[in-house]
Amino acid sequence: LCDRRQRQMCIRDRNNGSKGQILCKVCSTAFSPEENRFSKSYSLKCPHCNHSLAHKKDRKHFVVHKCVNPKCPYYLHNLNKVDKKDLKEDYGKNKYKLHYIYREFQIDFFRMDLNTLPKNASSLKFSKHDQHVMSLCLTYKVNLGLSLRKTAQALKDIHGISISHQQVANYCKTASVCIKPFVDNYDYKTGNVFTADETYIKIRGIKTYIWFIMDAAKRSVIGYQVSDNRGVGPCILAMRMAFQHLKELPKNFKFIADGYSAYPLAAQQFFHEFGDKFKFEITQVIGLTNDNEVSKEFRPYKQMIERLNRTYKASYRKTNGFDNIDGANYDLALWVAYYNFLRPHKHNNYKVLNEVEMLSQADTMLGKWQLLIFLGQQTILNLQHGEAANCS
């Protein structure tokens, strides 16, 4: 079959055995069966010079394409801005990104479901204990930051309840399944300044990353994600969670992060997906010292999210790491629920960040956890009937 004419009647013959080319005797087209230019479905073009982009690198979630045309207007414009001292050095231009670069994403992170629930959770039908014991487990484990084994020991020593640490873990996972949809879909009435950062935890000794996005006005955690990599994909998912109740960005919107490259790339994808309604620049606070005016002005916001990281790491440290990513997911979801709805904050006059009328009616923390589970169940029913917000 001739690849150009796509007809069976075209007889092929070897044109040059050393190079492996094939010559069609009907249309006289020479081509290679391994690398055939006629089988390409599309080719990416540079928007500045219309030159075909070259495939440069393969990343986990995207492919990097680059315009290598030395006469490209984009390249020449950037080259004129390079310091002349660097041009005189050998490979001095390599300090800058001068060529047009395009990242072709292999996964559509804007179509992934944000409401995916953890697996292997037990049911709320109690065979040995009841919801009171479950609330005790959550209070000791999440509020007081005890490990699973110390939680089981506290129930035995203080309340005389014999329970294994694995059963405590099952209760926490079940509660997380119920509570997470409520926490993720709650409308936090955000302001116009968001701040973001990432930190790491250990799963069986391997680094896993936690992404946080905070509303600077109320200091609520409005976006979070657990990922096995530090790429742009989980950053997009955390941003989607933070933006899910916004039809467009507020005026004078600021998104403050560190100098990591995933945040500007994620912002580009939001503009590509939603247009001018979600067009924003990342204000990057780089380093630990105020070396420029941007760092000096926005350093307090960066310190705010860093304190959040330390607060979470303080509760995580007692766990001595996790066995799997599901355990990290349910632990983080419960901690965010506690931080946003149950934990008193000094800067808020020792009140919770988000007042929920139903939760304020409970006098004890045990009752608050049970009501959170109830609110989560109602949110799940609303999601099943399409009444909750569409996380896009």
Feature roles, as predicted:
Residues 250-264, 285-288, 352:
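Acidic/histidine-rich, metal-coordinating catalytic segments
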Residues 259-260, 269-300, 304:
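Conserved beta-strand -> loop -> alpha-helix junction used to position metal-binding or nucleic-acid-contacting
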Residues 318-392:
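C-terminal domain-tail junction helix/linker
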